[in-house]
Amino acid sequence: MEPRVSVAEAVSSLTIADAFVGACEGPAPPRPALPSRFICSFPDCSASYNKAWKLDAHLCKHTGERPFVCDYEGCGKAFIRDYHLSRHVLIHTGEKPFVCADDGCNQKFNTKSNLKKHIERKHGNPQKQYVCSYEGCKKAFKKHQQLRTHQCQHTSEPLFRCTHEGCGKHFASPSRLKRHGKVHEGYLCQKGCSFMGKTWTELLKHMREAHKEDITCNVCQRMFKRRDYLKQHMKTHAPERDVYRCPRQGCGRTYTTVFNLQSHILSFHEEKRPFVCEHAGCGKTFAMKQSLMRHSVVHDPDKKRMKLKVRAPRERRSLASRLSGYFPPKRKQEPDYSLPNASAESSSSPEAQLPPPAALLTVC
């Protein structure tokens, strides 16, 4: 009886040729999968990408869409990528998460690219410079792109050419070429009209003027052009309004708006009233320019600096009406929006009954 041969011995006894023969007889290994490409579906565009998010960002150039909007009050800037938005938000927060690790530096930056530029500019190799080869020049630059842009001055021919069909314009820097490219691409209005803006800002301006969407307060039905104006207005309906206290020692005065607090500090504590009324015989001074503008209506009611609305006084309700929950029907009254002549001195005029515009901002 022949002795048993272990698996290890059997494998070790195989020659290299036997191993190749055995491999050929077995099942063929699967072919390596080709990397998938994400292709732009717009006509006359051959762009393709290896990542889906890259294609999404590219499609925004065709549609003009900027889906990532900054929600900070009064900002409203929009971006194609979420990374660009998160980088922009650092401007509002003041956060600078990228710190230079060089000894004795510790400078902070809000983007990684700014940190990289700082390192190259301050701590980079001073020997690595790009020197202009034109006779008699010898100017040196830290970036090759800067050298190419500089050499356009010697050749008098701009280096960067627009490749759009029928254009062919030349530019001295890539940033100017990129800015020019928006003229051909444009931003199409998505509200059903044929407007094409050359820049995103131009499209936003068109949207504000041609497609106005008034925003209404659901409490008092007052209308606003911007959402941040409505947000500021909603504070007037809050059950407890914010109170701003004067920070100066020993003062303790409080105001319901930051504007009135600033006006109080400038005029009362710092005695600064740089804005003077130039109307003949007046000479009143104000701490804030807006206060002067409101005051000017007293001398010239035709100025459209401030719209005065005469509201009808609120009707008094009886105790029985309040307890029963019955609301009597409101009487329609046409308010008189006309402003009286500034020269009228009759005490029975509406101007005598209303406080002067300057008194709307109480300065203590």
Curated annotation (Swiss-Prot):
Organism: Mus musculus (Mouse)
PANTHER family per UniProt: TRANSCRIPTION FACTOR IIIA, ZINC FINGER PROTEIN
Annotated zinc fingers (C2H2-type), start-end: 38-62, 68-92, 98-123, 130-154, 160-184, 187-211, 215-237, 244-269, 275-299
GO biological process, one term: ribosomal large subunit biogenesis
Matches recorded under InterPro entries: TFIIIA_Zfn-C2H2, Zinc_finger_trans_reg, Znf_C2H2_sf, Znf_C2H2_type
Compositionally biased tracts (Low complexity): 338-352
Function: Involved in ribosomal large subunit biogenesis. Binds the approximately 50 base pairs internal control region (ICR) of 5S ribosomal RNA genes. It is required for their RNA polymerase III-dependent transcription and may also maintain the transcription of other genes. Also binds the transcribed 5S RNA's.
GO cellular component: nucleoplasm
An example Gene Ontology molecular-function term: DNA binding
Keywords per UniProt: DNA-binding, Metal-binding, Nucleus, Repeat, Ribosome biogenesis, RNA-binding, Transcription, Transcription regulation, Zinc, Zinc-finger
Database matches in SMART domains: ZnF_C2H2
Superkingdom classification of source: Eukaryota
Coiled coil: none
Protein name: Transcription factor IIIA
